[in-house]
Amino acid sequence: MLDPNLLRNELDAVAVKLARRGFKLDLDLLRSQEERRKVLQVETETLQAERNSRSKSIGAAKARGEDIEPLRREVNELGDKLDTAKAALDQLQAEIRDYALAIPNLPDDEVPDGKDDSDNLEVSRWGEPRQYDFAVRDHVDLGEMAGGLDFAAAVKLTGSRFVVMKGQIARMHRALSQFMLDLHTEQHGYQETYVPYLVNHATLFGTGQLPKFGEDLFHTKPLEEESDSSNYALIPTAEVPLTNLVRDEILEEESLPLKMTAHTPCFRAEAGSYGRDTRGLIRMHQFDKVEMVQIVRPEDSMTTLEELTGHAEKVLQLLNLPYRKMLLCTGDMGAGSCKTYDLEVWLPAQDTYREISSCSNMWDYQARRMQARCRSKTEKKPRLVHTLNGSGLAVGRTLVAVLENYQQADGRIQVPEVLRPYMGGLEYIG
């Protein structure tokens, strides 16, 4: 969420920045709420001071032998008025907070304006798409030819947008995740972390999935039910538990950056995506991903975004998969991001680039919700950290890219050299 001081003191400037994202800030509502808050705050403080003063008078009057009943009645009346004023202030502050939670992050000045992905800016390309002298097959046909992708079995077990992987395809899927983890931990300085796949509502609130995006999650209980200790949701990404590890913590600045990576399944309801990418592994309810998260000092976050994106790029480069780097426009960024790069890998069967990684600087948007702070040795007051996250990479989509880019005329798949140590030295599968 945004800094409340910005909404109080720089409202017009905030409105201009949010308008770039297509978000219309209700200035009249916010100004009226703030004026009402000030009035109630003064009223509450005045009543509190007056009641305290009258309460002290009771003891003095009693010592003088005076009748204290009128004072008691007055104190009780002031207490009732104070309770009413406090309740009104609490209600108003809850309304202010609810509205603030729906406000997206402010876009960085470098982010291009735009409405959707057609307005994203291509920053760079790496690698050249291969040329084939045979009819290119897509990953579904290749996987089924190898006996490794079974969508019919998944439909029987669960439903659509799931898959059963078998044999060498399943092995390659596992090899990819192990390769990614080894790269990030051994060369990029991340600490491998194992996290729960079920998280509570406080955790989902911390990274911004709740309250706005609850319909995109799989819940153990209906979201409408009152939250308790048994209300969980399956994680949509390891970003959620990894980032929340610093919730309500004050970190020593000398310990930053904190770099974490995790390989987890991810679960998404894909609300609103009906009819999109219905064939294959591109859009699934359950998919694996290796996630990278960094917790950094505020002044380091923009440099860190470039570094983190580079770590995701390195995976694609070592796999020799052509890709392009896109700077997302204001209309295509996630609500909590101030700047996002997408990496899009070349898929021969689709003759286009498709997203395989998204790397974002969340600024202090998540940290404020989580109250995640850091403190230096020279400053007594802690300050909010900045949080960043990125896919390093989506394992299923990487498998898609390997199957399609490394296919042979006879339907076999050449195993990328960097994966061969993870696959017993195999050079081809299928």
From Swiss-Prot:
Coiled coil location: none
Subcellular localization(s) per the UniProt record: Cytoplasm
GO molecular function terms noted in the UniProt entry: ATP binding; serine-tRNA ligase activity
Pathway of action: Aminoacyl-tRNA biosynthesis; selenocysteinyl-tRNA(Sec) biosynthesis; L-seryl-tRNA(Sec) from L-serine and tRNA(Sec): step 1/1
GO cellular component, one term: cytoplasm
Record-level GO BP terms: selenocysteine biosynthetic process; seryl-tRNA aminoacylation
Entries under CDD domains matching the protein: SerRS_core
PROSITE patterns: AA_TRNA_LIGASE_II
Keyword Coiled coil: no
Family: Belongs to the class-II aminoacyl-tRNA synthetase family. Type-1 seryl-tRNA synthetase subfamily.
Subunit and interaction comment: Homodimer. The tRNA molecule binds across the dimer.
Name used for this protein in its record: Serine--tRNA ligase
Species, as recorded: Serratia proteamaculans (strain 568)
Gene: serS
